[in-house]
Design a protein with these regions (language model features):
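Beta-strand->loop->alpha-helix junctions that form or flank phosphate-binding loops
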Residues: 23-26, 75-77, 96-97, 176-184, ...
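Glycine-rich phosphate/pyrophosphate-binding loop at beta-loop-alpha junctions
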Residues: 1-68, 109-156
Length: 231
Protein backbone atom coordinates (compact mmCIF):
# COMPACT_ATOMS: atom_id res chain seq x y z
CA UNK A 1 0.00 0.00 0.00
CA UNK A 2 2.98 2.34 0.13
CA UNK A 3 2.73 3.22 -3.56
CA UNK A 4 -1.01 3.89 -3.33
CA UNK A 5 -0.54 6.01 -0.20
CA UNK A 6 2.22 8.16 -1.68
CA UNK A 7 0.58 8.63 -5.09
CA UNK A 8 -2.83 9.44 -3.60
CA UNK A 9 -1.44 12.05 -1.17
CA UNK A 10 0.50 13.75 -3.98
CA UNK A 11 -2.30 13.74 -6.56
CA UNK A 12 -4.97 14.93 -4.14
CA UNK A 13 -2.82 17.97 -3.33
CA UNK A 14 -2.43 18.78 -7.03
CA UNK A 15 -5.96 18.01 -8.20
CA UNK A 16 -8.42 17.06 -5.43
CA UNK A 17 -11.08 16.10 -7.99
CA UNK A 18 -9.04 13.16 -9.29
CA UNK A 19 -10.57 9.82 -8.34
CA UNK A 20 -8.00 7.46 -6.82
CA UNK A 21 -8.68 3.73 -7.02
CA UNK A 22 -6.47 1.28 -5.13
CA UNK A 23 -6.06 -2.16 -6.69
CA UNK A 24 -5.44 -5.41 -4.83
CA UNK A 25 -5.23 -9.06 -5.72
CA UNK A 26 -8.28 -11.00 -4.56
CA UNK A 27 -5.86 -13.36 -2.83
CA UNK A 28 -4.18 -10.67 -0.71
CA UNK A 29 -6.69 -7.84 -0.25
CA UNK A 30 -5.35 -6.52 3.07
CA UNK A 31 -6.51 -2.91 2.45
CA UNK A 32 -10.06 -4.04 1.74
CA UNK A 33 -10.01 -6.14 4.91
CA UNK A 34 -8.68 -3.18 6.91
CA UNK A 35 -11.28 -0.85 5.39
CA UNK A 36 -14.08 -3.23 6.32
CA UNK A 37 -12.74 -3.64 9.87
CA UNK A 38 -11.89 0.03 10.38
CA UNK A 39 -8.28 -0.81 11.19
CA UNK A 40 -5.44 -2.97 9.85
CA UNK A 41 -6.31 -6.63 10.26
CA UNK A 42 -4.21 -9.67 9.45
CA UNK A 43 -5.32 -12.00 6.65
CA UNK A 44 -5.29 -15.72 7.41
CA UNK A 45 -3.46 -16.43 4.14
CA UNK A 46 -2.29 -14.71 0.95
CA UNK A 47 -1.72 -15.90 -2.61
CA UNK A 48 1.81 -15.78 -3.98
CA UNK A 49 1.21 -15.32 -7.73
CA UNK A 50 1.30 -11.52 -7.36
CA UNK A 51 4.12 -11.82 -4.86
CA UNK A 52 4.93 -8.11 -4.90
CA UNK A 53 1.65 -7.41 -3.09
CA UNK A 54 1.41 -10.61 -1.05
CA UNK A 55 1.00 -8.82 2.29
CA UNK A 56 -1.01 -10.16 5.23
CA UNK A 57 -1.17 -6.99 7.33
CA UNK A 58 -1.30 -3.38 6.16
CA UNK A 59 0.84 -0.86 8.04
CA UNK A 60 -1.00 1.58 10.31
CA UNK A 61 0.34 4.78 8.68
CA UNK A 62 -0.22 3.40 5.18
CA UNK A 63 -3.78 2.55 6.15
CA UNK A 64 -4.35 6.03 7.60
CA UNK A 65 -3.25 7.73 4.38
CA UNK A 66 -5.04 5.35 2.03
CA UNK A 67 -8.19 5.51 4.11
CA UNK A 68 -8.13 9.31 3.87
CA UNK A 69 -7.16 9.81 0.23
CA UNK A 70 -8.15 6.69 -1.74
CA UNK A 71 -11.70 6.88 -3.11
CA UNK A 72 -12.31 3.25 -4.03
CA UNK A 73 -10.82 -0.23 -3.80
CA UNK A 74 -10.90 -2.78 -6.61
CA UNK A 75 -9.76 -6.38 -6.52
CA UNK A 76 -8.62 -8.44 -9.50
CA UNK A 77 -8.25 -12.18 -10.04
CA UNK A 78 -5.14 -14.01 -11.21
CA UNK A 79 -6.81 -14.59 -14.58
CA UNK A 80 -7.47 -10.86 -14.97
CA UNK A 81 -3.85 -10.10 -14.05
CA UNK A 82 -2.62 -12.59 -16.65
CA UNK A 83 -4.85 -10.99 -19.29
CA UNK A 84 -3.34 -7.60 -18.43
CA UNK A 85 0.21 -8.94 -18.70
CA UNK A 86 -0.64 -10.23 -22.19
CA UNK A 87 -2.17 -6.89 -23.23
CA UNK A 88 0.88 -4.99 -22.01
CA UNK A 89 3.17 -7.34 -23.93
CA UNK A 90 1.06 -7.13 -27.10
CA UNK A 91 1.14 -3.32 -27.02
CA UNK A 92 4.68 -2.64 -25.83
CA UNK A 93 6.65 -5.92 -25.99
CA UNK A 94 7.37 -5.45 -22.28
CA UNK A 95 6.65 -8.15 -19.70
CA UNK A 96 5.29 -6.73 -16.45
CA UNK A 97 5.34 -8.64 -13.21
CA UNK A 98 1.92 -9.72 -11.85
CA UNK A 99 1.81 -7.06 -9.12
CA UNK A 100 2.83 -4.38 -11.60
CA UNK A 101 0.12 -5.33 -14.11
CA UNK A 102 -2.73 -5.12 -11.59
CA UNK A 103 -3.53 -1.49 -12.45
CA UNK A 104 -4.09 -2.40 -16.11
CA UNK A 105 -6.24 -5.37 -15.06
CA UNK A 106 -8.35 -3.03 -12.92
CA UNK A 107 -8.70 -0.45 -15.71
CA UNK A 108 -9.99 -3.12 -18.09
CA UNK A 109 -12.45 -4.30 -15.45
CA UNK A 110 -13.54 -0.77 -14.48
CA UNK A 111 -14.21 0.24 -18.10
CA UNK A 112 -16.28 -2.88 -18.70
CA UNK A 113 -18.27 -2.64 -15.47
CA UNK A 114 -19.07 1.05 -15.85
CA UNK A 115 -19.29 1.31 -19.65
CA UNK A 116 -16.68 4.07 -19.62
CA UNK A 117 -16.30 6.16 -22.77
CA UNK A 118 -14.45 9.41 -23.40
CA UNK A 119 -12.74 9.44 -20.01
CA UNK A 120 -9.06 9.71 -19.15
CA UNK A 121 -7.85 6.79 -17.05
CA UNK A 122 -4.32 6.29 -15.80
CA UNK A 123 -2.62 3.36 -14.13
CA UNK A 124 0.72 3.09 -12.34
CA UNK A 125 2.58 0.29 -14.11
CA UNK A 126 5.68 -0.83 -12.24
CA UNK A 127 7.89 -3.85 -11.79
CA UNK A 128 9.43 -6.46 -14.07
CA UNK A 129 10.25 -8.99 -11.38
CA UNK A 130 9.10 -12.09 -13.23
CA UNK A 131 10.78 -15.24 -14.47
CA UNK A 132 10.58 -17.50 -17.49
CA UNK A 133 8.60 -20.22 -15.69
CA UNK A 134 5.84 -17.75 -14.85
CA UNK A 135 5.19 -17.09 -18.54
CA UNK A 136 3.63 -20.48 -19.24
CA UNK A 137 1.25 -20.00 -16.33
CA UNK A 138 0.36 -16.51 -17.59
CA UNK A 139 -0.19 -17.75 -21.14
CA UNK A 140 -2.60 -20.47 -20.04
CA UNK A 141 -4.50 -18.33 -17.55
CA UNK A 142 -5.05 -15.31 -19.78
CA UNK A 143 -7.02 -17.38 -22.29
CA UNK A 144 -9.37 -18.43 -19.50
CA UNK A 145 -9.50 -14.95 -18.04
CA UNK A 146 -10.44 -13.45 -21.40
CA UNK A 147 -13.02 -16.23 -21.91
CA UNK A 148 -11.30 -17.44 -25.06
CA UNK A 149 -11.01 -20.97 -23.69
CA UNK A 150 -13.20 -23.29 -21.65
CA UNK A 151 -12.01 -26.30 -19.65
CA UNK A 152 -14.22 -29.35 -19.09
CA UNK A 153 -14.02 -32.72 -17.36
CA UNK A 154 -15.95 -35.28 -19.42
CA UNK A 155 -16.75 -38.98 -19.13
CA UNK A 156 -16.54 -40.85 -22.44
CA UNK A 157 -16.93 -44.56 -23.31
CA UNK A 158 -13.75 -46.63 -23.07
CA UNK A 159 -13.80 -47.96 -26.63
CA UNK A 160 -12.12 -47.39 -29.96
CA UNK A 161 -13.32 -44.26 -31.77
CA UNK A 162 -14.92 -42.68 -28.69
CA UNK A 163 -12.66 -39.62 -28.70
CA UNK A 164 -13.23 -39.05 -32.42
CA UNK A 165 -16.97 -39.20 -31.80
CA UNK A 166 -16.60 -36.73 -28.93
CA UNK A 167 -14.66 -34.29 -31.14
CA UNK A 168 -17.38 -34.44 -33.77
CA UNK A 169 -19.88 -33.32 -31.11
CA UNK A 170 -17.95 -30.07 -30.59
CA UNK A 171 -19.12 -28.60 -33.87
CA UNK A 172 -15.70 -27.84 -35.35
CA UNK A 173 -14.33 -26.11 -32.25
CA UNK A 174 -10.58 -26.32 -31.67
CA UNK A 175 -9.28 -28.50 -28.82
CA UNK A 176 -6.47 -26.71 -27.01
CA UNK A 177 -5.60 -29.41 -24.48
CA UNK A 178 -6.41 -33.05 -23.88
CA UNK A 179 -5.60 -35.27 -20.89
CA UNK A 180 -6.81 -38.86 -20.63
CA UNK A 181 -7.38 -40.89 -17.48
CA UNK A 182 -8.39 -44.54 -17.62
CA UNK A 183 -11.28 -45.18 -15.23
CA UNK A 184 -12.65 -48.67 -15.95
CA UNK A 185 -13.23 -51.10 -18.78
CA UNK A 186 -16.33 -49.18 -19.79
CA UNK A 187 -15.51 -45.55 -19.03
CA UNK A 188 -12.68 -43.01 -19.35
CA UNK A 189 -12.28 -39.55 -17.82
CA UNK A 190 -10.88 -36.78 -19.99
CA UNK A 191 -9.82 -33.23 -19.25
CA UNK A 192 -10.26 -31.08 -22.34
CA UNK A 193 -9.63 -27.43 -23.22
CA UNK A 194 -11.84 -25.95 -25.95
CA UNK A 195 -11.21 -22.69 -27.81
CA UNK A 196 -14.21 -20.36 -27.67
CA UNK A 197 -15.57 -18.13 -30.39
CA UNK A 198 -18.44 -16.48 -28.51
CA UNK A 199 -17.18 -15.79 -24.99
CA UNK A 200 -19.07 -16.68 -21.83
CA UNK A 201 -22.36 -17.49 -23.56
CA UNK A 202 -20.67 -20.42 -25.28
CA UNK A 203 -19.86 -22.19 -21.97
CA UNK A 204 -23.47 -23.17 -21.30
CA UNK A 205 -24.05 -23.95 -24.98
CA UNK A 206 -21.22 -26.52 -25.00
CA UNK A 207 -22.40 -28.07 -21.73
CA UNK A 208 -25.97 -28.30 -23.00
CA UNK A 209 -24.91 -29.85 -26.31
CA UNK A 210 -22.69 -32.47 -24.66
CA UNK A 211 -25.29 -33.37 -22.03
CA UNK A 212 -27.88 -33.67 -24.77
CA UNK A 213 -25.68 -36.19 -26.56
CA UNK A 214 -25.29 -38.33 -23.47
CA UNK A 215 -21.96 -37.07 -22.11
CA UNK A 216 -21.56 -36.32 -18.43
CA UNK A 217 -19.46 -33.15 -18.33
CA UNK A 218 -18.41 -30.54 -15.79
CA UNK A 219 -17.29 -26.98 -16.55
CA UNK A 220 -13.99 -26.43 -14.71
CA UNK A 221 -13.15 -23.07 -16.30
CA UNK A 222 -13.58 -21.24 -12.98
CA UNK A 223 -12.23 -24.04 -10.80
CA UNK A 224 -8.99 -22.82 -9.22
CA UNK A 225 -7.84 -26.32 -8.24
CA UNK A 226 -8.19 -27.54 -11.83
CA UNK A 227 -6.39 -24.52 -13.23
CA UNK A 228 -3.47 -24.95 -10.86
CA UNK A 229 -2.97 -28.70 -10.78
CA UNK A 230 -4.75 -30.57 -13.56
CA UNK A 231 -3.19 -28.86 -16.57
Amino acid sequence: GGLAAGISVYLKQLKPEIKIIAVESEESACFKAAKDAGEPTSLSSVGIFADGVAVKLMGSETFRLCNQYVDEIMTVTNDEICGAIKDIFDDTRVIAEPAGAMSVAAIRKYVKQNDIQGKKLGGILCGSNTNFHTLRYVSERCELGEQKEAVFAVKIPERQGAFKQFCECLGGRTITEFNYRYASENEAHIFVGIKLRGGRAEFSEITRDLNGKGYECFDLSDNELAKLHVR
